[in-house]
């Protein structure tokens, strides 16, 4: 039912069935920022319903404004590919080395091209990107081939890519299932789809519920678990070969990113120590709040 306290009017919103199984039997879990998060009674997929009629247009505007706010784009791009970030991206790109380096690797939601730089540095000859935020897309296209439209609307040759990467993407999309179908059609046989997304079956969610930092109705409109993302990948012909999780934020409501007093600094330090201890545990389970999945095209 429409929430009269929402900042959006009813004409801005649209009711949708479950993107995984197609049923229309949602159970309301909680509300956040005027949006209802529901769980499908049939398959357990969690999603926002009703949601904005044009969620992708909303995302494009938001992330383009965010990119434009950075000002010096060269400086921002350097920040996105330096120090620990660079090491992490190089390590990730190296994981795909068993695939054909002379082939093609696609990063959907490539931003300022940090991962594309890592892939090129590891020897990939044809790193490519997709980015819907014009400011970021125009910047990265100076260095790599970048298309500025939704993946499903792009006409690639079938079986074009060896690896397709989706980092913090599918939770924003109107239909993650449609994107997975397009990814399957654009991967070579044995090609790899790599997805990173928030994990709704995490210890962070258990402790924080709707206060969890990744919940915000107009932005993250799908929330997956290891179970539901595996089901959706399987429904689109993929075989899941690995699932991992990491990370935890236990007190997002009170965590101060820029402390202004000794007490706040002390509180932050204690929180970070607790989170590091718990992260050691959740990395060995599937309870981390960051979910990463590797799936192969059969």
Features from the language model and the residues they span:
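S-adenosyl-L-methionine-dependent methyltransferase catalytic module, highlighting the catalytic core
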Residues: 166, 174-182, 192-298
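Conserved N-terminal segment of class I S-adenosyl-L-methionine
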Residues: 1-167, 177-180, 245-246, 257-261, ...
């Amino acid at each position: 039912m429409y929430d009269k306290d929402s900042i959006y009017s009813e004409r801005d919103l649209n009711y949708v069935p479950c993107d995984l199984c197609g049923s229309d039997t949602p159970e309301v879990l909680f509300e956040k920022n005027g949006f209802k998060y529901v769980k499908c009674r049939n398959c357990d997929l969690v999603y926002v319903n009703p949601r904005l009629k044009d969620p992708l247009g909303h995302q494009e505007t938001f992330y383009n404004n965010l990119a434009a706010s950075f000002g010096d784009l060269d400086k921002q791009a350097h920040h996105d590919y330096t120090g620990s970030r660079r090491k992490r991206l190089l390590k990730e790109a190296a994981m795909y080395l068993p695939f054909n380096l002379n082939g093609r690797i696609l990063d959907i939601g490539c931003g300022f091209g940090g991962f594309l730089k890592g892939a090129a540095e590891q020897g990939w000859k044809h790193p490519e990107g997709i980015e819907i935020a014009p400011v970021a897309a125009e910047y990265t296209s100076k260095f790599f081939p970048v298309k500025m439209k939704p993946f499903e609307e792009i006409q690639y040759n079938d079986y074009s890519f060896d690896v397709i990467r989706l980092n913090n993407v599918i939770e924003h999309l109107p239909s993650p299932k449609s994107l997975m179908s397009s990814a399957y059609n654009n991967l070579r046989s044995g090609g790899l789809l790599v997805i990173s997304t928030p994990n709704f079956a995490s210890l962070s969610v258990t402790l924080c519920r709707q206060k969890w930092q990744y919940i915000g109705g107009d932005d993250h409109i799908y929330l997956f678990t290891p179970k539901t993302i595996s089901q959706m990948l399987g429904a689109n012909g993929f075989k899941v070969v690995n699932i991992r999780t990491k990370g935890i934020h236990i007190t997002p409501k009170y965590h101060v990113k820029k402390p202004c007093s000794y007490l706040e600094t002390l509180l932050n330090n204690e929180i970070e120590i607790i989170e590091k201890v718990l992260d050691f545990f959740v990395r060995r389970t599937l309870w981390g709040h960051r979910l990463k999945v590797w799936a192969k095209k059969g």
